Amino acid sequence: MSDASTVKVAIVGASGYSGEELVHRLLHHPQAELTEVTSRQYVGQTLSQIFPRFAGQGVADTLQFTEPDSVALAAAAEIVFLALPHGVAARYAQDLLNAGTKVIDLSADFRLNDPAVYEEFYGKPHPAPELLSEAVYGMPELHRDNIRSARLIASPGCYPTSILLPTAPLLKAGLIKSTGIIANSLSGVSGAGRKPDVPFLYAECNESVRPYGIPKHRHLSEIEQELSLAAGEQVTIQFSPHLIPVTRGILTTQYLAPTENFKTAEEEQVLAQRLTTCLAEAYSQEPFVRLLADGVLPDTKHVTQSNCLDLAWRLDRRTGRLIMTSAIDNLVKGASGQAVQALNLLCGFDETAGLQ
């Protein structure tokens, strides 16, 4: 595909929250033609019938949901997005790849390099372990060149995105220790998906904040995998996610130990400059990572509906800790937006296409 080309794309599982966000981004993408959307629940109905907000936008009034069929999908699209639960996505990926179609998978099925780790965290054997060696972890800021040449892209999870982008450059540069990392995340309820589930009903979540998945949330597996790659050694972290009564957004705070002591104001100033330089070198040219100004801290309201991660940090001389905070929209940078960013790299498009 040339830089000026248009690519035909399809979405399997287009009626979920991530699928809906994908539809929104692709309807307005200048070089993507949405040719197929699937949902067993809404077969025969158009996009705008199920999502009235899309009425009058592109093909939304005419494109109908179909039953997911790998043969039909491969015939209709050059690249297929899988917005399906883990365990289900892999079955479609295998057939689509065999048909010569490229796949961007939003599930967890291809994020992990080791099938034994997948089984440990997801409770069942990996459905397509033979594909793991060629799957590329689809975080552009960390794996841009590999994404460009991939057949199978594993779009990262929402929590990992909020944790990895702040921390990976510092580990790689040796500015923080690989031990004792603590990450606490607060997430909106859309992260649980659209399927009705009593713990995530409005009456259960409103006026309430609660932890879940402690001490071994599934996303911990890919977080530790990617941090270990950055550090060049095994990294184990403490991760505690919390559900908060908002629709979308993740705010993550991490507590890290710098490799240098900073017991005096002068030492703190030197370390602060090194941290500033490291993060600037990693992200000053990145379109979707915003390093916030001094005195400004991330706020989920400021990233809602955007593909940006907002990042700030503070040194605490009293405890000897580096505190990093980040905010993302879990459905955009934490899911569909990051997947479209990978599409752009895969096709040689402007990386920001469909994401502004």
Stretch-by-stretch model annotation:
Residues 308-311, 315-356:
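NAD(P)-dependent Rossmann-like dehydrogenase/reductase catalytic/cofactor-binding core
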Residues 169-173, 257, 342-349:
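Active-site catalytic microenvironments for nucleophilic, acid-base chemistry
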Residues 21, 25, 165-169, 222-226, ...:
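Alpha-helical scaffold segments in soluble metabolic enzymes
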Residues 8-11, 154, 253-255, 324-327:
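Short glycine-rich or small-residue beta-strand-to-loop segments that form or flank ligand, phosphate
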Residues 3-4, 260-263, 347-355:
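Generic C-terminal helix-cap and adjacent flexible tail
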Residues 17, 134, 158-165, 214-222, ...:
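Conserved active-site and cofactor/substrate-binding residues in soluble primary-metabolism enzymes
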Residues 2-207, 212-214, 314-317, 353-355:
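N-terminal Rossmann-like NAD(P) cofactor-binding subdomain of oxidoreductases
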Residues 33-76, 179-185, 189-324:
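C-terminal substrate-binding/catalytic lobe of Rossmann-fold NAD(P)-dependent oxidoreductases
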